[in-house]
Curated annotation (Swiss-Prot):
The lineage of its organism: Bacteria, Pseudomonadati, Thermodesulfobacteriota, Desulfobacteria, Desulfobacterales. It comes from Desulfosudis oleivorans (strain DSM 6200 / JCM 39069 / Hxd3). It catalyses: succinate + ATP + CoA = succinyl-CoA + ADP + phosphate; GTP + succinate + CoA = succinyl-CoA + GDP + phosphate. This is Succinate--CoA ligase [ADP-forming] subunit beta. ATP binds at K46, G53, R54, G55, E99, V102, E107. InterPro entries: ATP-grasp, ATP-grasp_succ-CoA_synth-type, ATP_grasp_subdomain_1, Succ-CoA_synthase_bsu_CS, SUCC_ACL_C, Succ_CoA_ligase-like_bsu, Succinyl-CoA_synth-like. Coiled coil: none annotated. Mg(2+) binds at N199, D213. Substrate binds at N264, G321, I322, L323.
Length: 388
């Protein structure tokens, strides 16, 4: 789960991480008033959406007066901001952050992230702040410093010093930088985050260290422990189908292709999408119904897949274990009765009660393609899509 920049900065301040003073507003008039209250110009007007790359898309603007802040906010609010992360359709801007401008001496990058390779936590830092860190990692990886932290031992002062020295910070900035790293790390651990990022972290002309931007990703599986964070969720920033799927405990991610797929298990789902692509088609979604799915969940899964107008065919790929094949088959029949399945359906299943599952489907009278293997299923899907 993600939250907005202004919400993240509120969390930052509770952990002793300095940020510019700012106000979140949702009208142009309020933006002008907020600009006048901040105590000096220029101010920065920043569109509040969950996607990155806002500056390049025109979502971050400098205002030298309250009237200019009002005008800029008016142009942003109600518009669709297009960034490299939103896709061509963009994201509707419903809030802006009006923030005090600061004098920047140096821009840095700083983040704390879960590292799967070491099963630990890594502090990532770079002097290439304010830039697309993925691009920096690809073109000039030597510019990124990594400090690995054992999660059982926790953060120590030497980790912070290692990062500070690696960034060539002036002596007077090392102590405030250490405080920022400590706060960021504690926030990461306390809230079960997968990423906490400041880009850029700035050194001001008066030697202060400050978070100019803020981003945090929370582990969805741990949100039951953080009701305060869950209350910050903005479903307007999320894909409507993904929000709907979450109501039924379905793991769904919308994609750009035209082959819907329903699978049990994340690994099998990713392999299924790979096979679809190898067969020359494109997956329209990732949908893991999980091992404990029942007929109702299967029906809801079909309803969500069919809500996507791009879908021209559906591939069901199930390895029956906890989710038995007969339960899946009953769910398919139930979905066909209650939800008009108006696209071709390809079903491949193996495992527990597979013969009973195949019998249920065979006697249902449904128009579907039964595949003997995953390769056969993908080939059938590709044929159906090509003929559509």
């Amino acid at each position: 789960m993600k939250i907005h920049e202004f919400q993240t900065k509120e969390l930052f301040r509770t952990y002793g991480i300095p940020t510019p003073e700012g106000r979140m507003v949702n009208t142009a008039e309020a933006a002008g008033e907020a600009a006048g209250e901040l105590g000096g110009f220029p101010v920065v007007v920043k569109a509040q959406i969950h996607a990155g790359g806002r500056g390049k898309g025109g979502g971050v603007k400098l205002a030298k007066s309250a009237d200019e802040a009002k005008s800029l906010a008016g142009a942003m609010l109600g518009s669709r901001l297009v960034t490299p992360q939103t896709g061509p359709e963009g994201t509707l801007v419903q809030k802006v952050l009006v923030e005090q401008g600061v004098s920047i001496a140096k821009e840095l990058y700083l983040s704390v992230v879960a590292d799967r390779e070491t099963a630990g936590i890594v502090i990532m830092a770079s002097e290439a702040g304010g830039m697309d860190i993925e691009a920096v990692a690809e073109t000039t990886p030597e510019k990124i410093l990594k400090v690995f932290v054992n999660p059982l031992a926790g953060l120590s002062a030497f980790h912070c010093r290692q990062a500070a020295y690696g960034l060539n910070l002036p002596a007077e900035a090392i102590k405030p930088f250490t405080q920022v790293v400590s706060g960021l790390f504690k926030l990461f651990v306390d809230y079960d985050a997968s990423l906490v990022e400041i880009n850029p972290l700035i050194l001001t002309t008066d030697k202060a260290v400050m978070a100019l931007d803020a981003k945090i990703n929370f582990d969805d599986s741990a949100l039951f422990r953080h009701k305060d964070i869950l209350a910050l969720r903005d479903t307007d920033e999320e894909d409507p189908l993904e929000v709907e799927a979450s109501r039924f405990n379905l793991n769904y991610i919308n994609m750009d292709g035209n082959v819907g797929n329903m699978v049990n298990g994340a690994g099998l789902a990713m392999a299924t999408m790979d096979i679809i692509k190898l067969a020359g088609a494109e997956p329209a979604n990732f949908l893991d119904v999980g091992g404990g799915a029942n007929a109702e969940m299967v029906e809801n899964g079909f309803r969500i897949i069919l809500s996507d107008p791009k879908v021209k065919c559906i591939l069901v790929n199930i390895f029956g274990g906890i989710l038995r094949c007969d339960v899946l088959a009953s769910g398919i029949v139930q979905a066909a009765r209650n939800t008009a399945i108006h696209v071709p359906l390809v079903v491949r299943m193996e495992g527990t009660n597979v013969d009973e599952g195949k019998r249920i489907l065979a006697e249902s009278g449904l128009d579907l393609h039964s595949a003997a293997s995953l390769k056969d299923a993908a080939a059938r899907v590709a044929q159906v899509v090509a003929a559509a």
